[in-house]
Amino acid sequence: MPDVRRCDFCGRIIEPGTGKMFVKNDGTILWFCSSKCERNMLKLGRDPKKVRWTEKHREFMAEQRGEL
């Protein structure tokens, strides 16, 4: 059974056989579900907690409100 992976930017589940794996020079592996996520993290350098449409932002805001 293939591993279920999550996008390192938005937190969505990546279906097996889809998505993109990016390996940094230090050996860190990043998984992206779409080019939108890849661009936002690598090219634009955005923090997932500050981008409103990501799961990581929703989790961060819930934590700030004390819902978790």
Curated annotation (Swiss-Prot):
One Pfam family it belongs to: Ribosomal_L24e
Residues in C4-type zinc fingers: 7-37
Binding-site residues, Zn(2+): C7, C10, C33, C37
Gene3D superfamilies (alphabetical): Ribosomal protein L24e (2.30.170.20)
Keyword terms, alphabetized: Metal-binding, Ribonucleoprotein, Ribosomal protein, RNA-binding, rRNA-binding, Zinc, Zinc-finger
Record's GO cellular component terms: ribonucleoprotein complex; ribosome
Cofactor dependence: Zn(2+)
Details of cofactor binding: Binds 1 zinc ion per subunit.
Matching InterPro entries: L24e/L24_sf (IPR038630), Ribosomal_eL24 (IPR056366), Ribosomal_eL24-rel_arc (IPR055345), Ribosomal_eL24-rel_N (IPR000988), Ribosomal_eL24_CS (IPR023442), TRASH_dom (IPR011017)
GO biological process: translation
Disulfide bonds: none
Protein task: Binds to the 23S rRNA.
Family statement drawn from the similarity comment of this UniProt entry: Belongs to the eukaryotic ribosomal protein eL24 family.
Record note on quaternary structure: Part of the 50S ribosomal subunit. Forms a cluster with proteins L3 and L14.
NCBIfam families cross-referenced by the UniProt entry: PRK14891.1-1 (NF034186)
Protein name in the entry: Large ribosomal subunit protein eL24
Organism: Methanopyrus kandleri (strain AV19 / DSM 6324 / JCM 9639 / NBRC 100938)
